[in-house]
């Protein structure tokens, strides 16, 4: 084991503490003091140090929230203290009866009794066990006595501390709480699913539960799960708490989030007022609650009251009325998302749901329509929860009229008229219009101008948004028609910046075929595939005229991608867009393909660290031009690794696997040799004499 320099060890400890503090400030205090970008920079620095010095990596490091190797199954966990359910109250009278029962049992005045009240989050209950301050086990509620060990998944949730904070750390503590998903995170998760053609979740609770039960914890790590603590079930060591609210205060000092809405109230009036007040706040929350939990605050009184069968006498759950109504589905229209995904939107007979008039609801995709069995004209059940878009959750088939009609996916985009496509295995249909489709215009232009595409310096996302909104730019070619005088009229874009942007646009006209193919945004055509297409066909015309069979013969191109490419070039408006770009002066050198050998064909190379003589992208392009595939990871099949300055874990892995490693000097020498040999062998033959 190599000796770690003291300065490195101290820096790692500092980063560890800074990241822990940032998590505490964000999730517990709700007072973030650094930006997301600053947090990410600290995390990347710690990851880099741990990659160079694996001994620094600890189970409670903030870097260990990315997930571990997939498990084969979840082990059963027997709860040391059963996770019991609560009795329910559905109105003020039942709340009053609960307070009276408690007061009678304790033989006291109900008006003087203190109750701790908090929202009942609609998620998944879990139990977390900490030994000497470190998380050792996390389990689901299960049937209340036996749950499942989901420790690896729970470790990925940033609002769950891997190591407890403070000086008074108990030898053992079991903390219970709810894993849930905010509406904002849920909508973003479903947006990504729609873009990728995956199934969407019906509601945040299902999303949270499904994420927590993934055998592959890296999936849970990518989901926006959160945790809120509500109970101390076991505690060993110093315990000076006299009330439930005392325990919740201690949980905050240990690093847990508790509900910011909890309150300690007195008597029947206080309990009823809290439930009414929370009910008024309910629709403005960024997460689902299905009620309130009312607990006798005194721990001594809790012990005296005890339990009846499956529930404690000292607590009750107040349930709010369901946020559902029935109405008529009048029609279905299809909206086009920023990457072309078609989403069916239900047009409803307006109905009041949870105090809000609902006239539209999402149907997600055609699979969901088929699952529901819904038809236009049906009486449907509509649910609304907080800020989540209202959705249809069922059909009242007993009220179905004879005049209903089926919902059909349009064959052409309702925005631009392009052909729609739905590939086998995908649940979403998409518009194939790409750059031509106004609904996709902003994102298509941002991709076109991005660093790995045409790399237009100074053309940021906000500026593109503004140019599209003012209708100054409708196609990529319009970018190259912009004039400095007009650009200078825009807010925060002075004359000098406007001139710089026009110069950058002029420079971007000179590109490569591979970059251009990538820039035009053919679905699923990334950098590597674009480079393969450029090498294989040599010109845009040859690529645009290629058959499906010819496309499938290209390295990295399978039947699905071939179909995307083929469809793109068969759309007349896409051809017009390409001709327009060439008309404003976008050019590239055509790639020589006839007779040009590729000395690195079939080889995979990896670039790591910083190169002084060129950028990594330039090095990658030169390797690809010689036939190599350039990968971002090292394996036994890697032919060689080019190691620049500050090469990290890829260098170490290559050395461990016995993969050849060369420095930049050797790389330049080999490039010169390979490119010279390729050029000499590729000399064109002299034309035959003509009579």
Curated annotation (Swiss-Prot):
The active site is at 120 (n6-amp-lysine intermediate). It holds the Pfam family DNA_ligase_ZBD. It comes from the Bacteria. Zn(2+) binds at residues 413, 416, 431, 437. One of its GO terms (cellular component) is cytosol. InterPro entries: BRCT_dom, BRCT_dom_sf, DisA/LigA_HHH, DNA_ligase, DNA_ligase_AS, DNAligase_adenylation, DNAligase_N, Hlx-hairpin-Hlx_DNA-bd_motif. It is an enzyme of class 6 (ligase). NAD(+) binds at residues 36-40, 85-86, 118, 141, 178, 295, 319. GO terms for biological process: DNA repair; DNA replication. Its cofactor is Mg(2+); Mn(2+). SMART domains: BRCT (SM00292), HhH1 (SM00278), LIGANc (SM00532). Belongs to the NAD-dependent DNA ligase family. LigA subfamily. DNA ligase that catalyzes the formation of phosphodiester linkages between 5'-phosphoryl and 3'-hydroxyl groups in double-stranded DNA using NAD as a coenzyme and as the energy source for the reaction. It is essential for DNA replication and repair of damaged DNA. This is DNA ligase. It comes from Chromohalobacter salexigens (strain ATCC BAA-138 / DSM 3043 / CIP 106854 / NCIMB 13768 / 1H11).
């Amino acid at each position: 084991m190599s000796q770690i320099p003291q300065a490195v060890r101290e820096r790692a400890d500092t980063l560890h503490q800074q990241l822990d503090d940032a998590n505490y400030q964000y999730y517990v205090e709700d007072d973030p003091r650094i930006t997301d970008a600053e947090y990410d920079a600290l995390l990347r620095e710690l990851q880099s140090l741990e990659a160079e010095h694996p001994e620094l990596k600890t189970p409670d490091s903030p870097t260990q929230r990315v997930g571990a190797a997939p498990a084969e199954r979840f082990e059963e966990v027997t709860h040391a203290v059963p996770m019991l359910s609560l009795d329910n109250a559905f109105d003020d009278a039942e709340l009053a009866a609960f307070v009276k029962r408690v007061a009678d049992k304790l033989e006291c005045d109900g008006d003087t009794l203190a109750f701790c009240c908090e929202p009942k989050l609609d998620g998944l209950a879990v139990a977390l066990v900490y030994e000497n301050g470190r998380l050792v086990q996390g389990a689901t509620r299960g049937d209340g006595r036996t749950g499942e060990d989901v420790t690896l998944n729970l470790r990925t949730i940033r609002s769950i501390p891997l190591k407890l904070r403070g000086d008074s750390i108990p030898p053992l503590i079991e903390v219970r709480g709810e894993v849930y998903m905010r509406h904002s995170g849920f909508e973003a998760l479903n947006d990504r699913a729609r873009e990728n053609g995956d199934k969407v979740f019906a509601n945040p609770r299902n999303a949270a539960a499904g994420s927590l039960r993934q055998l592959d914890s890296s999936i849970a790590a990518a989901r926006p799960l959160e945790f809120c603590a509500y109970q101390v079930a076991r505690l060993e060591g110093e315990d000076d708490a006299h009330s439930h609210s005392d325990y919740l205060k201690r949980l905050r000092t240990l690093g847990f989030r508790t509900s910011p809405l909890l309150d300690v109230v007195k008597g029947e009036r206080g309990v009823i007022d809290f439930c009414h007040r929370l009910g008024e706040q309910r629709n403005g929350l960024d997460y689902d609650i299905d009620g309130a939990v009312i607990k006798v605050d005194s721990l001594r009184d809790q012990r005296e009251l005890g339990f009846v069968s499956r529930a404690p006498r000292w607590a009750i759950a107040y349930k709010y009325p369901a946020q559902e109504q029935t109405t008529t589905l009048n029609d279905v229209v299809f909206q086009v998302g920023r990457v072309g995904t078609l989403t069916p939107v239900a047009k409803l007979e307006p109905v009041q749901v949870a105090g809000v008039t609902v006239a539209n609801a999402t149907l997600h995709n055609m699979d969901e329509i088929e699952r529901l069995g819904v038809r236009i004209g049906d009486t449907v059940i509509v649910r609304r929860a907080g800020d989540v878009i209202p959705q249809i959750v069922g059909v009242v088939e007993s009220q179905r009229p004879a005049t209903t009609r089926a919902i059909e996916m349009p064959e052409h985009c309702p925005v631009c008229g392009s052909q729609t496509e739905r590939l086998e295995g995908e649940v979403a249909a998409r518009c194939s219009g790409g750059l031509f489709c106004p609904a996709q215009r902003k994102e298509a232009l941002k991709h076109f101008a991005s660093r790995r595409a045409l790399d237009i310096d100074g053309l940021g996302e906000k500026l593109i948004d503004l140019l599209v909104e003012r209708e100054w730019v409708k196609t990529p070619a319009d970018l190259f028609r912009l004039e400095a005088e007009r650009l200078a009229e825009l807010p925060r874009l002075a004359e000098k910046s406007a001139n710089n942007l026009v110069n950058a646009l002029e420079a971007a006209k000179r590109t490569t075929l591979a970059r251009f193919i990538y820039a035009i945004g053919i679905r699923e055509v990334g950098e590597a595939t674009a480079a393969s297409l450029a090498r294989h066909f040599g010109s845009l015309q040859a690529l645009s005229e290629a058959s499906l069979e010819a496309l499938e013969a290209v390295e990295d191109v399978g039947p699905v991608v071939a179909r995307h490419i083929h469809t793109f070039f068969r759309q007349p408006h896409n051809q017009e867009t390409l001709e327009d770009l060439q008309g404003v002066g976008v050019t590239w050198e055509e790639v020589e393909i006839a007779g040009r050998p590729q000395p690195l064909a079939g080889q995979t190379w990896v670039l790591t660290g910083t190169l002084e003589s060129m950028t990594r992208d330039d090095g990658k392009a030169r390797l690809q031009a010689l036939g190599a595939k350039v990968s971002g990871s090292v394996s036994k099949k890697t032919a060689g690794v080019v190691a620049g300055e500050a090469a990290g874990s890829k260098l170490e892995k290559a050395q461990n696997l016995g993969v050849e490693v060369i420095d930049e000097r050797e790389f330049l020498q080999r490039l010169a040799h390979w490119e010279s040999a390729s050029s000499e062998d590729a000399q064109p033959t002299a034309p035959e004499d003509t009579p």
